Amino acid sequence: MAKYVIGSAWPYVQTVPHLGNMIGSVLSADVYARYLRLRGHDVVFVSGSDMHGTPIEVEAIQLGVDPAEYAFKMHGVVAELFKRWNISFDLYTHTHSETHVAFVQEFFKRIYENGYIFTKDEEMPYCPRDKIFLPDRFIIGKCPYCGYERARGDQCENCGRLLDPKQLVEPRCAVCGSKPEWRLTRHWYLDLRRLEDKIRKYVEENPHLPQNAKEMSLAMLKEGLKPRAVTRDNKWGIPAPFPGAEGKTIYVWFEAVLGYISAVVEHFKRLGKESEWEKYWRDPDTKIIFFVGKDNIPFHVIILPALLLANGGGYTLPTTTASTEYLLYEGDKFSKSRRWGIWIDEALHLLPADYWRFILVYIRPENRDTSFTWAQALEIVNKVLNDDVGNYVNRVLSFIKSRMGGVVPPPGTPQEEDKSFLQAALQLFKKAERHYEAVELKDALHTVVEIAREGNRYLNARAPWDLLKTRPEEANAVMYHAYWSLKMLAAGLAPVIPESVEKMWEMMGRPASLTWDEALREPAPGVKLGEVKPLFRKVGEDEVKKMLQALEQMKREKASKKYPWEQALL
């Protein structure tokens, strides 16, 4: 049994996440954490709401509310939605917790004492109208690299490059649109230059990093790492702990990534095992894996390891950052302003959570940008989830229920065809295992579905309904092996569609606790089945048209409400 810390990128609670955010981090992390638990590993799965920083402060100013009120209300909304999506966090917290604030301040004090922090006076954009400095998202302009018109002062969300406000072309205040002035202010910087060789070694020698994470990180290293300001002039954040830094806060990205540690601290504190966290974050054998979209790669592959090294506290460096490409919606980027896409609160009013989980993992953008389309979603639900998976489960269990007394038959007299089918199912199951281990979640799901397809072909070829009349022992063998394959199917699908598999396992008579190893064990004859009902249903084209109409209505209703927490559909 290995120890794992699994972290999904902390959602910024300025708004509700959309489907792309979901598959890029939270859902992917949940699938992997559930798989690891099925394998019997010791897993701590954490995340939390990213509460601080300029976007929330800007939005709060524009709405006339306190940033803390805004952040806490949105945290409650997002936490509730993740529950409804069946996300199995061990702890979902937030960056304004006492534990996180104290941890971040002590962590940066140590970096300062180690000599990796220096001060520099420099000109920063200042809005004379609003009388505030304009860090990060307080300032927008054209990206100097890709030309994106609404790049932020810290990063371009279009090309992912880290930016400095002075690099923006035609900058303007995000609050009022005014042209900024440049005024002198003092900031505290992390000297990334002194850590560059160690970071390069970490990236180059890491065999687990996905291609996009490695390529983006090596490109940044090739350009040379530059010192990055760890303080900001905005008010809503964690007060900087450095001497003379009164009135400054820690830059949101530098403190949010430390949440992966502070959340584990908080988790064990809640369990009354306060020092237990060190067995995870200070044990070199612990596997630490983050799930993020590609725009978050620099902060997880460069910045966080740099912070851990600069702190010198014996922290284990992350094993990998499982980064996805972007999910598009009908060929275009999600856009709240253009009402383009589906947000996770809207989705649950259209289809059950397991349907969405299955669709998103089935099309997970692992190697290239992928587009969600309703046509493809319809095909996945109707042909894959219902016809391939649901139909096979129903065929096997309904036959045993109606023709074999509702109990798992004895192994009977297996023929070569039965042995061949079992071997094929086992090989697919082990192949799915390899994909899960490599965090290739889409390929893992596609492989698990093949077990059901193989099973449907097997039943058609062996025709147990005919064998039952003349060779009942062979019919027993067929249905025994088919039932065994359902155990593999259940284990393989459980990380993706947990609620449906729970129902499936109940129908199968709960032969044992569902684990990965249990799927490989021969079934015990005589297990009594539960009530057998179809697991899934088809979705018609007319129903999709109604869904799209309902989606538009939801978006109109949202737009009519002032506050984001009122807009969320709970």
From Swiss-Prot:
> Could you tell me which Pfam families the record lists for this protein?
Anticodon_3, tRNA-synt_1g
Keyword presence, Transit peptide: no
Q: Which cofactor does it need?
A: Zn(2+)
Q: Which residues bind ATP?
A: K336
Q: Which GO terms describe its molecular function?
A: ATP binding; metal ion binding; methionine-tRNA ligase activity
GO process terms (BP): methionyl-tRNA aminoacylation
Q: Which domain of life is it from?
A: Archaea
* Motif placement: 'HIGH' region: 11-21
Specify whether Metal-binding is a keyword of the entry: yes
Q: What does this protein do?
A: Is required not only for elongation of protein synthesis but also for the initiation of all mRNA translation through initiator tRNA(fMet) aminoacylation.
Alphabetized HAMAP family for the sequence:
Met_tRNA_synth_type1
Q: What is this protein called?
A: Methionine--tRNA ligase
Native organism: Pyrobaculum calidifontis (strain DSM 21063 / JCM 11548 / VA1)
What is this protein's gene name?
Answer: metG
